[in-house]
Amino acid sequence: MPIITRTFTLEGDTMPLLLGAHDANLRELEKLLTSDIHVRGTELTLAGDPDDPGDLPLSQAVITSLLDTVNQGVNVDVPMVQRTVSMLSGPSEEEPSEVFSTRVVNVRGRTIRAQTAGQKHYVESIAKHTIVFGIGPAGTGKTYLAMAMAVNALRSKDVNRIILTRPAVEAGENLGFLPGTLNDKIDPYLRPLYDALRDMMEPEQARKMMDTGAVSYTHLRAHETREDL
């Protein structure tokens, strides 16, 4: 049976960076793509079915995109492989390598980057606009990326301080009956913001910034924030 092949010749340490630790990325590609993948030395060859017009083009686009990601200095892992295949096989118009190369901030020896097209659009919107509303399911990075953008702005001296805030009262809720000060009452609502901040800074650094007021918290109200974020 005739087959169609496409061969990529890689240079330097590109091959191990593409295949991942213990070839984890390669195994994931073999599961997600219908083309056969053969690796020999510095060459990676795709073998596709000529009767399936979408087989080889998708595989070729995925490998090309992952190589672009590697060449931009991004550490490609299995989730990135999965998202690359998903984006290129779906309706998304975003180029995966451009998504993964969207750097938010370097913290504690690692780089926080956008992981999806939606996250890329979110961080770009925060950079361009004064107020941005992020709406979506839990666990999609809304709070974490907002905090990462705030930390980056503070480090770059684009703002003087970060103000952590949430509405003092949730929709249909009355906090008046709860014991303690207003700060005591809203503290649980700010917990995800605290957790994100502590993940991006050493505990002592986070405490120092809160003690000096570089990072402060308050309930949402009319407030002068010309040089705050």
Residue spans for each PLM region:
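Pre-Walker A adenine-sensing motif
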Residues: 117-125
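Interdomain "pre-motor" coupling segment immediately N-terminal to P-loop NTPase/helicase cores
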Residues: 47-98
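Dynamic helix-loop-helix/coil hinge segments at AAA+ ATPase domain boundaries and subdomain interfaces
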Residues: 106-117
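Conserved P-loop
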Residues: 144-209
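Conserved glycine(s) of the Walker
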Residues: 141
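Conserved small/polar residues in nucleotide/adenosyl-binding loops
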Residues: 218-225
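Hydrophobic anchor at the beta1->P-loop junction of P-loop NTPases
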Residues: 134
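The conserved Walker
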Residues: 138
